[in-house]
Amino acid sequence: MNFEGLDPGLAEYAPAMHSALDPVLDAHLNPSLLQNVELDPEGVALEALPVQESVHIMEGVYSELHSVVAEVGVPVSVSHFDLHEEMLWVGSHGGHATSFFGPALERYSSFQVNGSDDIRQIQSLENGILFLTKNNLKYMARGGLIIFDYLLDENEDMHSLLLTDSSTLLVGGLQNHIIEIDLNTVQETQKYAVETPGVTIMRQTNRFFFCGHTSGKVSLRDLRTFKVEHEFDAFSGSLSDFDVHGNLLAACGFSSRLTGLACDRFLKVYDLRMMRAITPLQVHVDPAFLRFIPTYTSRLAIISQSGQCQFCEPTGLANPADIFHVNPVGPLLMTFDVSASKQALAFGDSEGCVHLWTDSPEPSFNPYSRETEFALPCLVDSLPPLDWSQDLLPLSLIPVPLTTDTLLSDWPAANSAPAPRRAPPVDAEILRTMKKVGFIGYAPNPRTRLRNQIPYRLKESDSEFDSFSQVTESPVGREEEPHLHMVSKKYRKVTIKYSKLGLEDFDFKHYNKTLFAGLEPHIPNAYCNCMIQVLYFLEPVRCLIQNHLCQKEFCLACELGFLFHMLDLSRGDPCQGNNFLRAFRTIPEASALGLILADSDEASGKGNLARLIQRWNRFILTQLHQDMQELEIPQAYRGAGGSSFCSSGDSVIGQLFSCEMENCSLCRCGSETVRASSTLLFTLSYPDGSKSDKTGKNYDFAQVLKRSICLDQNTQAWCDTCEKYQPTIQTRNIRHLPDILVINCEVNSSKEADFWRMQAEVAFKMAVKKHGGEISKNKEFALADWKELGSPEGVLVCPSIEELKNVWLPFSIRMKMTKNKGLDVCNWTDGDEMQWGPARAEEEHGVYVYDLMATVVHILDSRTGGSLVAHIKVGETYHQRKEGVTHQQWYLFNDFLIEPIDKHEAVQFDMNWKVPAILYYVKRNLNSRYNLNIKNPIEASVLLAEASLARKQRKTHTTFIPLMLNEMPQIGDLVGLDAEFVTLNEEEAELRSDGTKSTIKPSQMSVARITCVRGQGPNEGIPFIDDYISTQEQVVDYLTQYSGIKPGDLDAKISSKHLTTLKSTYLKLRFLIDIGVKFVGHGLQKDFRVINLMVPKDQVLDTVYLFHMPRKRMISLRFLAWYFLDLKIQGETHDSIEDARTALQLYRKYLELSKNGTEPESFHKVLKGLYEKGRKMDWKVPEPEGQTSPKNAAVFSSVLAL
């Protein structure tokens, strides 16, 4: 409402006028109103007022049910009945919001919305509440958590808001425009100009938007264009309030008089059918608020600020007998609202009290309200009391610190003796089956325990204490869960054992003796590691992705290219997919498909990993196609979900994976509809297994694949000819075959698993029958011999029985397009190639041979929750780059475990624990069809000046000078580097029984600031990069003491730093690495690990290792700077510019002391003196008040004199 022209003392609220009220001293406060209200020290009421026993509510007549204090002494500025729950929301002039539950007005929540401005409008949504202040729109949960905070322009003065639909909001005020805001993206989508400024009230019907102006006019606007259709000049002074119901519009306001503005007692009523005014309605109160209350009739409730309320019909006469008084505690009523059910009225006064009037003893605010979620009571667990009267009370209930001294309760040495544990009995089955030679027995190792590790458990103790154990000691009797001992060791889920040194003492070479790089598994959502490896070893995909670069912040193609580059550079060391998975978590489609797992679900294996990785496979191919498509078509840089997969010719990903099809729908009326489409992968469709299970019918894999590609099905579909849904025969025909055939196996139930198992048994019998006596019973080879057996040329090696078991999948398939749009698919063997000739010659006739390149497998293991691994056939180009040899070999990729395997192992699926999930077949000679050259897309322009994301950043706050064109770094140049980090997830650790701590999962760090300083030239030591990295993830610890990062520094809305994206800074560092600069810093190994960069060792000059002696502790940068440079750094917090500059100076000092590395013996003496001084000082730098720092000359002269 508008108070323009009124007495300023009544229209405005001055905080000084409303100090904290004392019920005894304030004459305006009704003592009976607050006699049961408990006030906290700040003067806020804590409980609602109970209804007096004498109050009697008459049905159909509004009477006061409850009064409650929202905030003592602070006027109520707005009230609103929640449209979804039984709640009443109240906002105050002090920016505080309070909610009350139910007609009893029990306090539900109370929180501060704005620290300086009053709350002007409240709107309830399904998931939260919208609060409008002067220039701020805040969306908060009903408990008080902020969902979003949208800052408007500082010059705006907003008064009204209108929710047009579930995701669109109109906001108006005293300016000459109305803003449209999209609540999904929290962005301004439209700004409508208003001819008459000052929109303080807005309403909506199914015909118009209604805008009430401070000039006294009401404008009716079109719902689509927002143009003025009609305008009512209601009052000559100002508009106070109006409401719309049906075809009537009623308004109250102020008229101009000789002495100023006066409240007009005539309500203006307009007929919206004829668009003209009808007879004004004279009332007996000074109207300030009005609302239609359409229950039985279209009644109007007219409220005055003094507390008088009158009901009347808008087309009749007002009756003075229909007036009742609200009895406000303060002198004025400030707000009024009606519930959606019309059973309750809410009034707020100038003293912070809220009055609830109802027409029934048990009213409801909404016709259909959902249940309200209440906070759980705070329960504090107390330690159980100890009863000292009990003689047998164990003293172990009292916690005592760990000590090595003798305790009073220790037994004397004379009364105790060591008793060795009895050896557990040998399993009876092992004793029965072992072979004896003399008195020595021999038995095969059942492989159920680790070497030299046997749990001590006696039989009698098992029955008494461990009867819940489900795993017996003997291998016999484990038929209930056979996979507990069937899973081969290399297929089990691998974990990293962390020590106090982190990953430095973990031997990754034990798990990977090749030069290929594995991927670390401890990152959230790292279940896709195996699929990343599959995509990497597709040579056209690897080259294409590494050539891609766009400006989108979270582009999966860009991040995957950066990760592929790291895998190229690595020489057997595992890599991390931090940045890729970070971008993956921001894609809305990934979350909608359920691909984002919680840490608890991923660790426990609650999700179906096979189904999950198949959905991820479909998602990543579609997303890469979109990312590449957006770069190649003219409309660049659209949103992540802005385009759908439509044509295979739009991107190279489409050319590789896309299969063009024709979908034919034939109705029984004879009409046929043909629609062209494309797909990036196929899903296996299995035949009805009910008969095959009994008869053992043989299905070739090629038959099942053809049935899945050329799918025929009967379904109900719309027929345009019949104009109704009819039974339709839908047929899918292939028009163009893909270069890479991707197949999701969809083995999601025991039915599909039994089908694979049955077909493997039938294939085994046929293979044994085919080869006859040529099959050897056992053929074992050393691991190094598999390279020679992988793909012998010109020689057919007869397989062994073990190699034929559980095999149904062919290594090659042959596909041919027929003239009648059909497809022929058959299994292809090496013998077929010798008979029909090479596949290359037949491609001219539309015949293609696909070779199996990868299989992704789900490992079932209840102990670890299962895992995903991949068998990948690594091509010649990869071996040439990594090992300098030219051959092909199958490998097992299990996170950071990489091991060469026989090719038959890649197609052997024991359905008890090894279930196929995804298959990749590639056309033979695929690499020759594509350009495999990689051109680095990162240019020197990434180092030039760029704008900051922070709104409040000013040029005076700039802490660095960007490089000029004549300063571009060259190969061998020095660059000082330092990075600061924040913590996203805390470390998970457990305390062992011996008191040592074991790290289960390390803390997840994220880079927050990266600084690079010039290492030579006239500007040496001046930073040219000092980027703060904006993050959208929740930070649990800013580590301010060690990083210097404060809350708000990484928020683009309030930060004053030079804020940029991680991708932007990553590109700068990648360019410096690619050009060959040398980085100087302290502890760079951790910095590059968190940033997710792989840097060649000859480009890293780490002072933590330059000033280090073997088998000695690492020395901090602070101590080195004090000892060698007489500098005291890192006083209160760390500063990355200071640390990078100090590391450069230390490197110069290292060159000076070691004579550029030519005198290692003299430098060794310096290091000995450093360590001796450090031990004496306990490695602590003296405080300024204490002893002075030793001067360089004195320190080194004493060292050199040794």
From Swiss-Prot:
Q: Which cofactor does it need?
A: a divalent metal cation
Q: Which UniProt keywords apply?
A: Cytoplasm, Exonuclease, Hydrolase, Metal-binding, mRNA processing, Nuclease, Nucleus, Phosphoprotein, Repeat, WD repeat
Which PROSITE patterns does this one have?
USP_3 (PS50235)
Major subcellular site? cytoplasm
Please state every residue range assigned to the domain named USP: 486-924
GO BP term, example: positive regulation of cytoplasmic mRNA processing body assembly
One Pfam match, given by its short name, reads RNase_T
Name the chemical reaction catalysed here: Exonucleolytic cleavage of poly(A) to 5'-AMP
Q: Which SUPFAM superfamilies match?
A: Cysteine proteinases, Ribonuclease H-like, WD40 repeat-like
Q: Identify the SMART domains for this entry.
A: EXOIII
* Broad enzyme group: hydrolase
Ways its activity is controlled: Positively regulated by the regulatory subunit PAN3.
Q: Which residues bind a divalent metal cation?
A: D978, E980, D1087, D1139
What Enzyme Commission number(s) appear in the record? Answer: 3.1.13.4
Q: Where are the WD repeats?
A: 153-193, 195-231, 244-280, 328-367
- Disulfide cross-links: none
How is this protein annotated for GO cellular component? cytosol; nucleus; P-body; PAN complex
Q: Which residues form the Exonuclease domain?
A: 975-1147
Complex formation: Forms a heterotrimer with an asymmetric homodimer of the regulatory subunit PAN3 to form the poly(A)-nuclease (PAN) deadenylation complex. Interacts with PAN3 isoform 1/Pan3L and isoform 3/Pan3S. Interacts with ZFP36.
Q: Which HAMAP family match?
A: PAN2
Q: What is this protein called?
A: PAN2-PAN3 deadenylation complex catalytic subunit PAN2
Q: Which organism is it from?
A: Homo sapiens (Human)
